[in-house]
Amino acid sequence: MTEHDTVLLAEDDENDVLLFQTAFKKVGVPKLLVCVPDGEDAIEYLKGAGIYSNRMEYPLPCLLITDLKMVKRTGFDLLEWVQTQTQFNGLPAIVLSSSLEESDKRRASELGAQAYWVKPAHFEDLVELVCLLKEKWLTPPQPADLSSIQNRLP
């Protein structure tokens, strides 16, 4: 696996992790989903520290998805830490939270989150969200088909 093949999910609810893994499989996301239980573990993963020191086994992610309300360190703590690390300037961060609070959405945006989505109540809606993730952040752009243009060139 390479960093282009990995998505890091920071989520403390085991049921939500299982639903997310199932949605990833259903949508056919061609990425490894690595799940950690809180913001502290996510930071350790990104640092390559402790049990995450083997980058062959724990490659850097191409996308970070985080819940906000977690034990130890929150999603806000994680976003704030990522924002201070220049090596992660290009890492897209998505918040998937049960919070409907505008202040949470605003703070997540201020801390660099590219999107803030409320956790859906139904699995089908989660599958739809994963489809959006795949489209926007997990599928490389396809090269333009230049054959029609090349055929018209002298």
Question: How would you label these PLM feature ranges?
Answer:
Residues 18, 22, 77, 100-115, ...:
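Alpha4 helix (beta4-alpha4-beta5 surface) of REC/receiver domains from two-component response regulators
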Residues 35, 72-73, 110:
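Residue-level signal for the "D+5" position in two-component response regulator receiver
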Residues 51, 76-89:
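Short amphipathic alpha-helix used as the core "switch/output" element in two-component signaling
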Residues 71-72, 101:
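The feature encodes the CheY-like receiver
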Residues 53-65:
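Active-site beta3 strand of CheY-like receiver
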Residues 67-68, 97:
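Active-site residues of response regulator receiver
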Residues 38, 59, 74-77:
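Acidic catalytic/metal-coordinating carboxylates
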Residues 5-15, 20-25, 33, 64-65:
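Conserved acidic segment of CheY-like receiver
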